[in-house]
A protein has these predicted regions:
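N-terminal ligand-binding/catalytic initiation module
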Residues: 1-25
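Rossmann-fold NAD(P)-binding glycine/threonine-rich loop
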Residues: 13, 129-173
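Glycine-rich adenosine-cofactor-binding loop
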Residues: 31, 49-74, 81-82
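NAD(P)-binding Rossmann-fold cofactor-contacting core
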Residues: 72-94
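NTP-dependent small-molecule kinase module
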Residues: 176, 180-198, 210-214, 293-330
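Conserved substrate/cofactor phosphate-moiety recognition/catalytic segment
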Residues: 206-239
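Glycine-rich phosphate-binding loop used to anchor ATP phosphates in small-molecule kinases
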Residues: 228-264, 268-269
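A glycine- and Lys/Arg-enriched "phosphate-lid" helix/loop adjacent to the NTP-binding pocket
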Residues: 261-294, 301
C-alpha cells in the first residue's frame, strides 16, 4: 500500500467516525483540512447539530467543509461569497439579508456564519472574531506555533485565573447564544487537566520518543508507550501518566477518541526549516504534510522540535502544562 493510499484510507475512517462519507469530488487536501476544521469546532464547544450554517466563501475547501458539517448533523448548510449584507455585525443581529443565499435557502437566515480566510501551507483552522461571526482562518504552521504560545500567555496575563478565562472563551465561541453550563464545563476541564493524562505523538524519526521521555522525567509522571492495539488498555485505570503514542495510533479514530477524552495531547513537529520548499528533506516534508491535518485535528498543541529533547520538553511544560494553571506573578 502506498503512502497516498494509506493517507486516503485514514481520511475515510475519520469521515466515517464523524458520521458520513467523504464527497467523491473533494481533493484529499481539502477533505483532510475540512475534517480538521470540523474536529476543531467540536472540540471548542460548537454544537452544530440541528443548526443552520452559512459558509461565507467559495471553492473546493468551502464545499468540503459544507459536506463535513452536513455529515455532522447540521440542519442546513449553504455556501456563498461574503459581502456586507450577509455578515451580522453583532451577536444579537444574526440574520440573513433579503436576497442573499442564506435567507433564500434557509428562512430567517443562518444560526452560524462561518467566514473563511486563506493562508499558504494550511495547517489548522483557527477560531477568531467577535461574537456573532465565526472566522475560520487557515494559518501556516509557524503562525499556529506562535498563536498557541500567545493563547497560553493570554490565559494567565493580568492575574486572571484560568477558570474565569475559560468561561470568557466559551462565551465568545458559543455564537449568538448564552453558554450552556455543560459547554462551559467542557472547556474548563480542558484547561484544568493538570492531574490527567498527557500524550505525546509525532512521526517516526522526528524525536517524539526522546521528548516524551524527557517530559516524563520533568513532570515525574510514569512513562507508557502506546501502540494501536493497546490504547483502551493503556488509558484504563489511574490518571497522571505520560503516554507516547506510536505513529499507527493516528490511523484508528476510536483510539484517537480515547486519547482526546482522557487528557491532553501534543504533537512534536520536525524543524520548520526542513519542511520548506527548495530546501531540507523533500520526502520528509511531503510525508509530514500528508498527515498534518489528521494529527492537528486531535492534538491540543504542536511544538517544533529542534533537536534538544530537554529544551522541547521544557517549552511544553512551561507554556502548555504549567502556565495555564498558575496565576502570573507580578
Amino acid at each position: 500500500m502506498t503512502a497516498q493510499q494509506t493517507y486516503t484510507n485514514v481520511c475515510k475512517k475519520l469521515w466515517a467516525y464523524f458520521g458520513g462519507e467523504a464527497p467523491a469530488a473533494v481533493v484529499p487536501a481539502d477533505e483532510d483540512l475540512a475534517l480538521g476544521v470540523f474536529a476543531g469546532l467540536y472540540r471548542e464547544g460548537f454544537r452544530l447539530a440541528g443548526k443552520r450554517v452559512h459558509i461565507l466563501g467559495t471553492g473546493s475547501f468551502a464545499d468540503a467543509l459544507a459536506a463535513c458539517l452536513k455529515n455532522g448533523g447540521a440542519a442546513g448548510v449553504t455556501v456563498g461569497e461574503a459581502n456586507d449584507d450577509t455578515v451580522p455585525t453583532t451577536g444579537s443581529a444574526l440574520r440573513g439579508a433579503p436576497g442573499d443565499t442564506a435567507s433564500e435557502t434557509i428562512p430567517g437566515g443562518a444560526a452560524y456564519y462561518i467566514r473563511l480566510a486563506g493562508g499558504e501551507e494550511p495547517a489548522l483552522a483557527r477560531l477568531t472574531g467577535a461574537e456573532g461571526v465565526c472566522d475560520l482562518t487557515v494559518l501556516p504552521l509557524r503562525s499556529r506555533l506562535l498563536l498557541d504560545a500567545e493563547e497560553a500567555d493570554l490565559l494567565t496575563s493580568g492575574g486572571v485565573y484560568p477558570l474565569a478565562a475559560a468561561v470568557g472563551i466559551v462565551r465568545g465561541r458559543i455564537l449568538g447564544t448564552a453558554p450552556a453550563p455543560s459547554e462551559i464545563e467542557e472547556v474548563v476541564r480542558r484547561y484544568l487537566r493538570g492531574a490527567s493524562d498527557i500524550a505525546v505523538t509525532g512521526l517516526l524519526g522526528d524525536g517524539a520518543s526522546a521528548v516524551a521521555e524527557a517530559l516524563s522525567r520533568l513532570t515525574r509522571r510514569p512513562f507508557v508507550r502506546v501502540g494501536r492495539g493497546n490504547v483502551a488498555e493503556a488509558f484504563a485505570g489511574a490518571t497522571g501518566r505520560l503516554f507516547l503514542l506510536e505513529e499507527g495510533v493516528a490511523a484508528d479514530p476510536a483510539a484517537l477518541a480515547t486519547v482526546v477524552g482522557n487528557g491532553r495531547c501534543v504533537f512534536v513537529a520536525p524543524p520548520l526549516d526542513t519542511l520548506k520548499e527548495g530546501g531540507g528533506d523533500p520526502a520528509r516534508a511531503a510525508r509530514y504534510r500528508s498527515v498534518l491535518g489528521i494529527y492537528t485535528a486531535f492534538c491540543d498543541r504542536t511544538y517544533e522540535h529542534t533537536g534538544d529533547p530537554q529544551d522541547t520538553a521544557r517549552r511544553i511544560w512551561d507554556d502548555f502544562l504549567r502556565a495555564p494553571y498558575l496565576k502570573r506573578s507580578k
